[in-house]
Amino acid sequence: MRHGNSGRKLNRTASHRKAMFANMAASLITHEQIVTTLPKAKEIRPIVERLVTLGKRGDLHARRQAISQIKDQDAVRKLFDAIASRYATRNGGYLRIMKAGYRQGDNAALAVVEFVERDVDAKGAADKARVAAEAAAAEAA
């Protein structure tokens, strides 16, 4: 019997699930929007919302708790500096999950997970370099 066992297993071991959610949370904090399958999106929401609440607390212990969960110093820095201040007056509900159709290869239900008041220009370093190169090429042409 599975009484009281909440959460989806997603056909992964516990360590794989933990690592996957840590990577997804870091990507979501860095890019402020990700596309994933609907069950993964529903599972990542409480994890990231808890991290944003830690960011709003802002003390050293909260920062260490966040680092122990996502292992990405840059994402934690952005979480505590930019994202926490953005949601200082909001009590929960920091993420939005929108259904995004079905994946062509296996017909899996997709979803877009994004921050409610997200920064549209938030991109990772690779994306910033690519956008800058495209802009420079467009001006040169």
From Swiss-Prot:
InterPro entries: Ribosomal_bL17, Ribosomal_bL17_CS, Ribosomal_bL17_sf. GO terms for molecular function: structural constituent of ribosome. Keywords: Ribonucleoprotein, Ribosomal protein. It holds the Pfam family Ribosomal_L17. The keyword Transmembrane does not apply. One of its GO terms (cellular component) is cytosolic large ribosomal subunit. PANTHER family: LARGE RIBOSOMAL SUBUNIT PROTEIN BL17M (PTHR14413:SF16), RIBOSOMAL PROTEIN L17 (PTHR14413). NCBIfam families: L17. Belongs to the bacterial ribosomal protein bL17 family. Part of the 50S ribosomal subunit. Contacts protein L32. This is Large ribosomal subunit protein bL17. It comes from Agrobacterium fabrum (strain C58 / ATCC 33970). The lineage of its organism: Bacteria, Pseudomonadati, Pseudomonadota, Alphaproteobacteria, Hyphomicrobiales. The gene is rplQ.
